[in-house]
Regions:
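Glycine-rich flexible loops
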Residues: 1-232
Length: 232
């Protein structure tokens, strides 16, 4: 058995969940799973339909974006994943989609506001939208720079990637991550639902205000804080 078999299997399992969850059309997204000890990750091959995937088709890449094992070209977003893994040692899996509502917010260049407890259960802050990159970055190493768009946005907002596990890239689409593939896929699905709920909320009440901080903190802390009491 290949030493990369585990992460290839997990990456495959994560990728095939995306169409089942309604997060992708055709080949519009990718999941990767990292092995930080080995400095590699497995990712979906570029342009391959989800129903044609298999664990063997996952491409193993190092944290510099170099292919280590695989016969197919890795996702065109590979360098973005590589930058994130290289700078975020506790990030175990990354999901990138073009899910409808989250992408619409990204194209609108808007953060997703924290309007209610569903949002606060998963994020203590608005979901940030990183600003579009400048022309020099676009014309340079575009996918590489996308990774730094994400990292720099989190730094500028004083947000930890361990606490906020989702983001929008302006004029592009959402990214989500987690310590495990399961959590990263979960976060990608949650992000799409938060985007949908926020959109509907603004249609019902265009002047709606963000939820008050005390309620945000209560819901986030009861699920994620030191004294969390949600779940078993």
């Amino acid at each position: 058995m290949s030493k990369y078999a585990k992460i290839k299997k997990q990456a495959y399992e994560g990728n095939i969940q995306l169409p089942k969850l309604g997060l992708v059309l055709f080949t519009f997204g990718n999941v990767s799973v990292a092995d930080h000890e080995s400095g590699v990750f497995a990712i979906k091959p570029s342009g391959v339909a989800y129903d044609e995937l298999s664990p063997e088709k996952m491409v193993v890449v190092d944290f510099e974006g170099n292919v280590i094992k695989g016969d197919l070209r890795p996702s065109s977003d590979t360098k973005t994943h590589a930058v994130l893994y290289r700078n975020c040692s506790k990030m175990g899996s990354i999901v990138h989609t073009h899910s409808t509502y989250a992408t619409a917010w990204a194209q609108s260049l808007r953060d997703i506001p924290n309007y209610g407890t569903t949002h606060a259960d998963h994020a203590i802050a608005d979901i940030p939208c990183a600003p579009p990159m400048d022309d020099k970055m676009i014309e340079g190493n575009y996918e590489y720079e996308t990774g730094f768009q994400i990292i720099n946005c989190l730094k500028e907002r004083h947000l930890s990637y361990e606490e906020l596990e989702m983001i929008l890239v302006g004029s592009h689409a959402p990214f989500a991550w987690g310590k495990s593939m399961e959590k990263a896929v979960y976060n990608a699905a949650v992000l799409e639902e938060l985007a949908r709920i926020a959109f509907i909320t603004e249609q019902i009440n265009p002047s709606v205000a963000r939820m008050k901080a005390s309620l945000v903190n209560k819901h986030f802390e009861r699920k994620h804080g030191k004294s969390a009491y949600y779940g078993q």
